[in-house]
Amino acid sequence: ELKEKEHLTYLFISHDLSVVRYISDRIGVMYLGNLVELASSETIFKDPRHPYTVALLSSIPTTDPDDLNKERIILEGNIPSPIRPPEGCKFHTRCFMACDKCKRVPPPLVEIEPGHFVACHFTDRKIDEEGNYLFDMPKMEKKSSKLADLPSEEEK
């Protein structure tokens, strides 16, 4: 309300995208100091295109029973040094979609749709309308959770 009334702009930095979703109109996702995806909050959550964004979104905890058994992306590989970042795409050492080109050529930040920018050699759609992943994820681990059993009236 204050932002709209006073025409304010602010920069909010967080690793918690579940909070960022409700505070920000536009989200920029950064990895190792580089912008890898920039779009409206709605677009980031409905149609993420960078593998790091997809991984971040998969890590958001949920209490929705329909999402409790949803696969989570477990990033593997070496975490690069920000002082001596790798050649090519900075995310390639942990990316589940990386190829040889990613190791050599830094991807440019390109506008794939109006207002949606991505720095990835593979900007094809990553998630369908139901939130299912549209690519093979060999580095995935299925996590399951169970709803807590509530005490019955007799146990209260």
What does each of the following model-derived ranges do?
Residues 150-156:
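Long, low-complexity, intrinsically disordered segments
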Residues 41-150:
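Charged, flexible cofactor/metal-binding loops and thiol motifs
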Residues 1-70:
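P-loop NTP-binding/switch modules centered on Walker-like glycine-rich loops
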